[in-house]
Amino acid sequence: MKYNDDNIQTGNTGNHLHNIGVHFTIAKGFTYAAKTVYGLGGTTFQFFSRNPRGSKAKVYLDKDIAQFQRLRKEYKLGPIMAHAPYTINLASPNESLRSFSREVVKDDIIRMESLGIEYYNLHPGNYLGEDKSEGIKQIIEGLNEAITKEQGITVLLETMSGKGSEIGSRFEELRQIIDGIVFNSKVGVCMDLCHMFSSGYDIVHHLEDVMNEFDQVIGINRLKGIHLNDSKNGFNSKKDNHAPIGEGHIGLEATLQLMEYPQLCSLPFYLETPLEDEGHRQEIQMLKCNLQK
């Protein structure tokens, strides 16, 4: 599959099968984000639920939210994903950080639910070289405090790259967490391509085997969204360094094959690549032009 730049267009034609979007800031509001992403050719987006390097939560204006909800219908935007801040760690051996993390997750779920956001994605946690089983236990306890039977939003556990003491780089770890959640019908998985490749799942040469394993261990019905990115580092590197699509070790062809995989093609795809708006516009169009229609 070769990238053909002759067909690159701007804007959103609105008639493409795949639901592709980007990670985008809401610093200027949801309305601005929706308009900009749609103008880039996207049909969904991901945003941080609060300051990704801190704890401050943005106050949303009612007028902005109302306009955003109208635009969602007008643009026919797919599921919107909120990403938890990097400062939380539900698996931390530090009780203070763990308590802070639980409060943030609980508050975020309530806030995102009130906005009609479909998915709340988080990194499961890092046991910081202590006891992995205790770390998994703490993640389960934290999520059980936050997830309710009545909520509509789905909490997603992100697949991780396996660097350091991260939890979530193996399907079995994610399954263990899910099994411990009381209301686990409210829990799913977000697959990050760079993380998957870096953690040792060969999505380039053995995609079908990887997806079969995912289905057997977790269940394909749990997979709700995909972070699109390439990897600056090689296979099984245990490193988390994103690259633009086609400029890393995963490559464009493998990315397209994954997006066309029968059990994945209807999922929302969120670009998490180190590019600005124009780069993302070109990336979205590159993917659309090369995908089967």
Which positions does each model-derived feature cover?
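Acidic/histidine-rich catalytic cores of soluble enzymes
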Residues: F45, I140, N144-A243
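Active-site acidic/histidine proton-transfer and metal-coordination neighborhood
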Residues: E74, L90-G188
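Conserved active-site loop/cleft motifs that coordinate metal ions or position small ligands
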Residues: Q46, K224-H227, S266-T273
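Active-site beta-loop-alpha junctions enriched in small/polar residues
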Residues: H23-A27, R50-P52, A84-T87, G125-Y127, ...
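Acidic (Asp/Glu)-rich catalytic clusters
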Residues: T36-G41, L61-M81, D108-G116, A146-Q151, ...
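Conserved, mostly hydrophobic/aromatic
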Residues: V37, H83, S101, M112, ...
